């Protein structure tokens, strides 16, 4: 095996077809064979990063250890490969053009006419090649669909890389949809044929096809696609009920073996130990609970994809299936919506819309003793609710929502104030991994099993230390602080007053893994399961073991 090998994942027909999960699953298979894999996403949009994008359009913003605001697919990569990636794992058109324009303005091109080829494509290639020194394979997912005008420079850069490293060191995998037409009663292969034709017109002949469908594609249709597209390696990736089955599906169809042979990789036998326990927990669950995600962006589940997967993983060890109940913070019937849930999670967000609904839902959860986990904005709203209804600070709020409140129990971080005045919103929050020291004997410390932790962050606002003492005097526990900046990182209620009520300023969902569930989510699932079992015992439906 000579040098780093490259695998490019492209998509056709429609977006959101599963390129990211295909890339993550293939990366997992190669990792399980002993290879060192680095994986990244190329996003063709002009935004520098997704940090300022609407979650209802783009989905969640995934935070890396080094503080990059990245595409949600980077979260899939981390979970499937069980690695921590950095900011080089997500490249956008905005980043590329910003860099090239900066180089031009500073005279680095020595008066050349700056063009898409070679200057933009050279910068894309440079970023594709950024990876640790000991890597065997770089998997690069190219966002969007072939034929999109925004994707053309990325496709061209990938073509050039294949020419530079040699065809034997580069593999192109094209993911395409094979739709089923109800009126005709058959699957249609023509969209995939056209998609591959567009890719070939750009100078790329795919080496393998991953055909997405809701129903199995007939052998005749697979052979037809292979013939018409001149591709021998054709894999049918049928929609599965849980995403962690995808590595098994791709392996059963031999995709990883094909890639290893094509790239002449020195790979060992596959070790399924990482996925065996996860799949067993999913397929053989012993119990089932319902946890509400109460948020502002429930219209698009992808806005909370890492929270969803963290909750699911929280139940794997105890073989507990976690069903998600979506509760919009603007819902007028929150009391009814939260009537029979076993637990609640209030994730992050921005802006004033839906805030009063969040505060109302949090009050319901606190007073009904529903196990509750607040994340970022969720924790801030927990503090606001407590200040209003327990401490008596009527009208308490955050300076994010109003400047007129008498009780700004959540306020703008000191270093963020000038940033907001100058309207510098992109990439300027408190981002990345920060340390917190937890109080001995607290719920937080008992869940983590230590008092010294690091979590990923993405915020501009903090709990106001000026009101902390009054909150503490009325029973709110400040159980974790960042000692360097004296920031409140964790709050909770005494377990004598509430079975599980905890909030964190961090985004713990970003560090959860299928095999290593995050302790906060694992704790929430355990508390929710206990609540359900007690309720069933009291109603005579079951006997506690």
Swiss-Prot record:
Region entry Amidoligase domain, spans: 1-265
Pathway the protein takes part in: Pyrimidine metabolism; CTP biosynthesis via de novo pathway; CTP from UDP: step 2/2
Domain Glutamine amidotransferase type-1 as annotated: residue spans: 290-534
Protein's GO biological process: 'de novo' CTP biosynthetic process; pyrimidine nucleobase biosynthetic process
Annotated Pfam families: CTP_synth_N, GATase
Binding of UTP, residues: 15, 188-193, 224
Principal EC category: ligase
Residues the record lists as binding Mg(2+): 73, 141
HAMAP family (UniProt xref): PyrG
Name recorded for this polypeptide: CTP synthase
Gene that this polypeptide is encoded by: pyrG
